[in-house]
Curated annotation (Swiss-Prot):
It catalyses: adenosine(1518)/adenosine(1519) in 16S rRNA + 4 S-adenosyl-L-methionine = N(6)-dimethyladenosine(1518)/N(6)-dimethyladenosine(1519) in 16S rRNA + 4 S-adenosyl-L-homocysteine + 4 H(+). It comes from Sulfurimonas denitrificans (strain ATCC 33889 / DSM 1251) (Thiomicrospira denitrificans (strain ATCC 33889 / DSM 1251)). The gene is rsmA. S-adenosyl-L-methionine binds at residues 13, 15, 39, 59, 87, 106. This is Ribosomal RNA small subunit methyltransferase A. Specifically dimethylates two adjacent adenosines (A1518 and A1519) in the loop of a conserved hairpin near the 3'-end of 16S rRNA in the 30S particle. May play a critical role in biogenesis of 30S subunits. GO terms for molecular function: 16S rRNA (adenine(1518)-N(6)/adenine(1519)-N(6))-dimethyltransferase activity; RNA binding.
Amino acid sequence: MEKIVAKKKFGQNFLKDESVLQKIIEAMPNNDNKIVEIGPGLGDLTKFLVDVKSVDAFEVDTDLCKVLQNKFEREIATKQLRIHCGDVLTAWKSELIEESYDLVANLPYYIATNIILKALADPKCKNILVMVQLEVAEKFCANDGDKVFGSLSIITQSVGEAHIVVNVPPSAFEPQPKINSAVFLIQKKSDRSDKDFEDMLRVAFTQPRKTLMKNLSSTYDKAMLQEIFEKLSLAQTIRPHQVSTNDYHQLYKLARSLDGTRERTEC
C-alpha cells in the first residue's frame, strides 16, 4: 500500500503511541451513547473505538477516506462504523447525527477550539474526550484564579466539569509536532450558555492584563458597571482571571436587569 504522508493543510499528526490510545479508551464515560470521531486519520484510534461502540467518523481528507474504507470494510458492512467524507463544520450546519453521542477524537490543532465549542453547543453531544494542544487543554480545564483562566474555562464550567486525562509528548505522534499535547475530558451537565453571555466574556478578556472594569467599560456603561461591581463586592482593580465563574454569571444577570430597567425609565 502507498505510504500516506501527513498533510500540513489539514494539521495532520498521526497518534501512534498505543499506551496513549489505551488511556483514551479507559477514560471514555460508561454509557450507551454513540461515538463521533473527527479527524480519524489512519484509523489508529478508530480501531479501538469500534471494538467498544458504534462510531461515526468524519474525515475531510479524501485520500484518508479511501484508506479508512479499505481498512474497516468489515466494520462498515456491519454498520459498526460510518465514515463521512467531508468538512465536519459544514455537516454541523444541520444535525451532525440523530442520536446522542460522545465526541472522542485526536483533533487537528487548527480547528480544535472551534470544534469543541460546537460540541458544547450541540445538545446531542453529552461528553467530549479529545486530544489537543496542551495550552488549549489547560484553558478549557482551568479553575477560577488560574493564570490561564479565561472565557473558554468559564464556558466549560458553565455546562459541566473538565479535567486533563494525560499529557502527551511530541514523540507519541508521526510526524512529531513542535508542541506538547494533552487529552482532556468534559462531562456535560447542561447545554452551552447563551450567546450574549459569551459575547460579554469576549469583551471581558479582550486584554487580560487590563482590569475587568477597563475592558468592560469599552462596551458597557461605566456607571452601571460601578454599581454592579459594588453589589458583587468586586474591586475596580480586579483583573479578568481573578473573577469566579459564578460572579461572571451574576455580573451578566445584573447587567441585563439594569439595562432593561434603564431602557424602561428612558421610555
